[in-house]
């Protein structure tokens, strides 16, 4: 066992310290270790029962670590020149689903892209291409708004929306534009007051 691992284990054992100043110091150190501390925290949560306060503190520390990871990834994403929409959507979804498999989302996006690509050709007008896109995206793959649980947080998580085919208008539009741009169709989001719409931006 290396020094870092032993330090994490020692800190985890101090989580139930009744002195708030000690706990805050321990919490800060564990957050600094980042995701490397999570397996030790989860193991202690499962195997060591020192009461409800102990377990609640562990849960909160894990959430704090995950939040810091997501925050840093989003800061890097906003600072990047590319600002890949799919990557950004996955980062946001990982706040709710930290263990989600990126490859499943990429593969699902690629499969839909292929279905549409097979029916497109250069002789079609923009209107015809969008009509084909809509038929496959909404008709074949059944993407639609979630009218029953419109305000559910999971409707903003791209992994859930890709699986259920239901989500809020923003994420449905996001997925639509991601696939369109992968097909070299110039469809981009336009942020209007209280609305987010898509537009075909043909120069």
Regions found by a protein language model. Name each.
Residues 1-203:
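A structural boundary/capping signal
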């Amino acid at each position: 066992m290396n020094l870092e691992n032993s330090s994490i284990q020692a800190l985890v054992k101090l989580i139930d310290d009744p002195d708030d100043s000690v706990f805050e110091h321990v919490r800060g150190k564990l957050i600094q270790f980042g995701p490397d501390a999570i397996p030790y925290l989860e193991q202690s949560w499962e195997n060591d029962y020192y009461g409800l306060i102990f377990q609640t503190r562990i849960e909160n520390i894990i959430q704090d670590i995950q939040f810091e990871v997501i925050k840093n990834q989003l800061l890097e994403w906003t600072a990047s020149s590319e600002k890949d929409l799919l990557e950004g959507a996955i980062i946001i979804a990982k706040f709710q689903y930290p263990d989600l498999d990126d490859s499943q989302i990429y593969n699902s996006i690629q499969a839909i892209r292929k279905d549409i690509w097979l029916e497109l050709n250069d002789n079609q007008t923009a209107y015809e291409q969008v009509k084909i896109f809509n038929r496959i995206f909404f008709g074949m793959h059944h993407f639609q708004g979630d009218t029953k649980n419109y305000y559910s947080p999971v409707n903003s998580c791209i992994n859930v929306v890709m699986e259920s085919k239901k989500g809020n208008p923003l994420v449905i539009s996001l997925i639509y534009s991601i696939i369109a741009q992968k097909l070299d169709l110039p469809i981009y989001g336009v942020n209007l007051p209280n609305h987010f719409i898509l537009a075909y931006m043909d120069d």
